């Protein structure tokens, strides 16, 4: 075989190899890797491998996929890592999309959902699906529509028949905004809850309802606005604005003209009457 034929065959083989590489560039698979973000790198791994779709600018991790960044961890059946090009022609992950059996973990909380999106730029996680819940050492927050956690603000937003439970006290509303603070051991504890729409606050001794409420948890003080009704045993108070001390059991009702068209405060008080003993 002449040198010319050998050279031609080598060229053909190289061209064929280049075509194969180009064709498979959009379907590259590997099991784990580190990816750059706007801030700290993120590590992604999966049992069934990670697929790279360069045209769509996304990595797809399948099979018990996990994404880790510092103390943040995202687990799901499938994780899609969306990336973008930077001004220096590098790439960075900016959005994680989790599909099925989503679990969000950190050192001080855990959350569950069916579908989740993590915005790395703003450190915000949004979960949707059934049985949405977020748990800290002391609180459990549930929702039917969506559940968000803003890491920088230490804020959880629960929408759709939302509840926040701490011990025997429960706050329920259409939307709950739960503000947290960090303790000395780096755990989270709720310090304020803002409730909007069909608000109901329950304790073993009383039930308070209204249109809106702000609950200062450490002080155990609640301010209710709009169509307020407080029930303690068989006694009931109605008004436009109420200040309730859950620790002492004292309630103060006010009337505000124009809030709900009712300028009066009403109360119904009952007491148990002992029946005379039969002789």
PLM regions and their residue ranges:
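Mature-chain termini and adjacent capping regions
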Residues: 2-279
């Amino acid at each position: 075989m002449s040198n010319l034929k050998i050279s031609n065959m080598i060229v053909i083989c190289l061209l064929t190899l280049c075509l194969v590489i180009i064709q498979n560039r959009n379907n590259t698979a590997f099991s784990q890797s580190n990816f750059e973000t706007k801030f700290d790198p993120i590590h992604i791994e999966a049992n069934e491998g990670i697929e790279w779709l360069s045209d769509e600018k996304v990595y797809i991790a399948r099979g018990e996929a996990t994404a880790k960044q510092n103390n943040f961890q995202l687990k799901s059946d499938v994780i899609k890592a969306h990336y973008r090009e930077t001004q220096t022609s590098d790439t960075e992950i900016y959005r994680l999309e989790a599909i099925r059996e989503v679990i969000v973990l950190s050192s001080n909380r855990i959350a569950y959902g069916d579908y989740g999106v993590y915005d790395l730029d703003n450190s915000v996680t949004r979960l949707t699906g059934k049985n949405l819940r977020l748990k800290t050492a002391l609180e459990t927050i549930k929702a039917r529509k969506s559940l968000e956690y803003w890491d920088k603000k230490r804020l959880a937003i629960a929408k759709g028949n939302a509840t926040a439970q701490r011990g025997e006290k429960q706050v329920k509303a259409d939307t709950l905004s739960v503000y947290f603070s960090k303790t000395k051991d780096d755990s989270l504890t709720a310090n304020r809850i803002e409730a909007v729409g069909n608000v109901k606050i329950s304790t073993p001794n009383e039930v308070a309802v209204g249109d809106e409420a702000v609950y200062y948890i450490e002080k155990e003080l609640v301010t209710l606005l709009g169509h307020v009704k407080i029930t303690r045993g068989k006694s009931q108070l109605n008004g436009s604005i109420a200040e309730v001390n859950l620790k002492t059991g004292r309630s103060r009702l006010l009337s505000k003209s124009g809030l709900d068209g009712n300028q009066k405060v009403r109360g119904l008080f009952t007491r148990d009457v002992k029946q005379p003993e039969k002789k």
